[in-house]
Amino acid sequence: MAGTGVVAVYGEGAMTETKQKSPFSVKVGLAQMLRGGVIMDVVNAEQARIAEEAGACAVMALERVPADIRAQGGVARFC
């Protein structure tokens, strides 16, 4: 088997998956969707106001942001 594929063996069979490149139109579409701003993680109203002024399209109010959880040795989601 030549090339840039992935082979996964399940029991006595094998499933192959070739690496596909996203077309330019998909990349342009993603860039256009993200153009309006970002979603920011905040812990209080002051941070939400700062995020809004900086151009955030939305905020997520959390008890603790993932960066703080990781800094304290915890495990947090990765985005």
Swiss-Prot record:
- Domain of life of the source: Eukaryota
Family statement drawn from the similarity comment of this UniProt entry: Belongs to the PdxS/SNZ family.
* GO CC entries: endoplasmic reticulum; plant-type vacuole
SUPFAM superfamilies linked: ThiG-like
Q: Which organism is it from?
A: Arabidopsis thaliana
Q: Which GO terms describe its biological process?
A: pyridoxal phosphate biosynthetic process
Organism lineage string: Eukaryota, Viridiplantae, Streptophyta, Embryophyta, Tracheophyta
UniProt-listed InterPro entries? Aldolase_TIM (IPR013785), PdxS/SNZ (IPR001852), PdxS/SNZ_N (IPR033755)
Name this protein carries in UniProt: Pyridoxal 5'-phosphate synthase PDX1-like 4
Its gene name is PDX1L4
What Gene3D superfamilies does its record include? Aldolase class I
